[in-house]
Amino acid sequence: MQATDQSNAVAYRGTGRRKSSIVRVRLVPGSGVMTINGKPGDLYLQFNPSYIANAKAPLESLGLENDYDVLVNARGGGLTGQADAIKLGVARALCELDPENRKPLKLEGYLTRDPRAKERKKYGLRKARKAPQYSKR
C-alpha cells in the first residue's frame, strides 16, 4: 500500500512476521539509514553483524541499500525473530515499490514467510514434547 509520509515523500509499506514478532516497515527515499523503534538500526540490533546483514539483505540483493531509509516499528519476540521479520517486511515493501522486484526477491527466498513457531506445552508433559521419566517396574 502506497502512502505519503509527513514530508510529502512517498512511503512504501510492508509487514513482516516471524515467531512471535510483528514488524511494520516503511521505505522512504533517502540515504540508507535504518531506524527501528526510534533507535538507529545497528544500536537496536546490538551491533550483531548477522542480524544487521539479515535485516538489510533484500535491499543489498537489489543494490538499493543507499537509496531508501528504512523506518521500522517492531513488537514482540526477540532480536532473531525481529531481524527476520524486518527482512520479510522490507522485501514486501520493495515489491510494492516496483513489481519487477518480485521475481529476484522470490528466487532469493526473501518473500517466504517462515512458519516455524514455538510449539505449545501439552498437559501431562514437562515441555512441548519432553515426557516425565518412565519406569517400567
UniProtKB/Swiss-Prot annotation:
The record's section on Pfam families has:
Ribosomal_S9
SUPFAM superfamilies, A to Z: Ribosomal protein S5 domain 2-like
GO biological process terms, alphabetically, are: translation
Gene3D superfamilies in the record, alphabetically?
3.30.230.10
Which chain regions cross the lipid bilayer? none
Domain of life, source organism = Bacteria
Q: Can you cite an annotated GO cellular component?
A: cytosolic small ribosomal subunit
Q: Which InterPro entries match?
A: Ribosomal_Su5_D2-typ_SF, Ribosomal_uS9, Ribosomal_uS9_bac/plastid, Ribosomal_uS9_CS, Ribsml_uS5_D2-typ_fold_subgr
- Identify a single GO molecular function assigned to this protein: structural constituent of ribosome
Q: Where is this region: Disordered?
A: 118-137
The UniProt keyword set, sorted, is: Ribonucleoprotein, Ribosomal protein
Cite the HAMAP family for this sequence.
Ribosomal_uS9_B (MF_00532_B)
What family does the entry list? Belongs to the universal ribosomal protein uS9 family.
Q: What is this protein called?
A: Small ribosomal subunit protein uS9
Q: Which gene encodes it?
A: rpsI
